[in-house]
Amino acid sequence: MPTIDVHKQDLEELVGRKFTIEELEESLKFVKGEIDGVSGHELKIEIKSTDRPDLWNVEGIARVLRAHYSKNQGIPKYNVIKPELTINVSEKVKKVRPCIAAAIIRDIKIDDDILKQLIQAQEKIAGTFGRRRREVAIGIFNLDKIVPPLLYTATKSDGLKFEPLDGERKMTPAEVLEIHPKGKEFAHLVNSHDVYPIIIDGANDVVSMPPIINSEKSGRVTKRSKNLLIEVTGLEMRNVETALNILAMSLADRGGKIEQVNIVDSRDNIIVTPTFAVKDFKVDKYLIKRTFGFMPSDKEIKSLLERSRYNVVSVDKTDDGHVHLQFPTYRQDIMHAMDVVEDMLMAYGFDNIEPHYPEFFTQGELKPATVRNRKLREIMVGTGAQEISTFILTNKKNLFEKMNLPDDEIVEIANPVSSNWSVMRSWLTPSLVELLSKNTNVEYPQKIFELGQCVKLNTRSQVGSEEMWKMAYSEAGSKVNFTHAKTILQAY
């Protein structure tokens, strides 16, 4: 779970009130957080939520707490300045790292707390939400050192030389990957391609080599920097825009002014970022009643939602009606009405719900499948294999194209939030191969297995599909062959 460092006085100034440690511990329940350590005025706060990157900095925590302790409720509103800066996107970068979004923050007064939180948020979001920069990487620059317009393109390994941040001399992209510490750490993200992403300004100076490193010239942000450029690159625009919005909001909460940026692709299509769009949503009042154990009044429902940073459009008068609401697009975690009701419960306070004894008791036991699975795991671990656990959601490319197989009929998601998670897996082998491909830098031999659920179409089933348990084993090494793998199966 993400753990962030926070200066208590900084948090109090952002919220607009003071806290004792006990009061703060209680208030952090609104963000699924708890104090993990105290050293003077420095706090370590653990956020027990891996799907709320907007809470992984002090500004995000303060944004939620302000809604509980002031009239500043509902979806936060941010004024934006119309764009002047343009980033042109070359066709060359499309197959390497296709998505980019950017924002300008003007007139920001940077102190030690802001600089510390900015760096921390950048690392937490890119590291966790961005899957160690694979899905999302963030660059923050001193705008006054950049000559517009910018070009996001791709270059060869011996392309434009530049001095990377904390570097000692100018280097080619290949040298950055071979010599610079960040280049060594993240080279695996780009070295499978014959060209590397790069951002160049109007003076033909390199601004950044995403997702690896910024340039020393414009990428060093200090307390003297007044105008910042934030750029986010990645594989899916939805994730890129979410990360950008979070950082832009955080700096706006510090007094900065948000200015949009034009993103122009090779076909002259223009996207303006950031945009603080909202989505409409409906929640059944019956679900609220069933979850709470009672039906809150319409006034209470509206108050709980606004304190949870939702806009309430309307509340139907009848108990079998709906609540019509809006939520910001950076809340990617909202996929079901229960996600909204959970926020309402946190705002109400779980401790305020009166417990009731169950009306009847039952005695449970392990299912036969669970007993079997435990035995299988014991056997596999006994052979020296390490168990892995991958997602049941995947995509057709992993299941078929990468396995050199024709497409087959499988269970697909009607409205996937990401093309990476658009189908249900029908077998486990691709998951093992994918993991091995991402761990080529780990010592060999590698022995892994997975025992997990798969899904196949079944027209005779009431839901049209059927779940089943499957197991797969894989071993990689210089002396591995089929005979060796067969002996593992004979362990049964």
Describe each PLM feature range:
Residues H68-S70, A101-D280, R290, Q386-Y492:
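TRNA-recognition modules of translation machinery and tRNA-sensing kinases, especially anticodon-binding
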Residues P2-E13, F19-G37, H41-K44, K48-A102, ...:
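Extended, well-folded interaction surfaces typified by the phenylalanyl-tRNA synthetase beta subunit core
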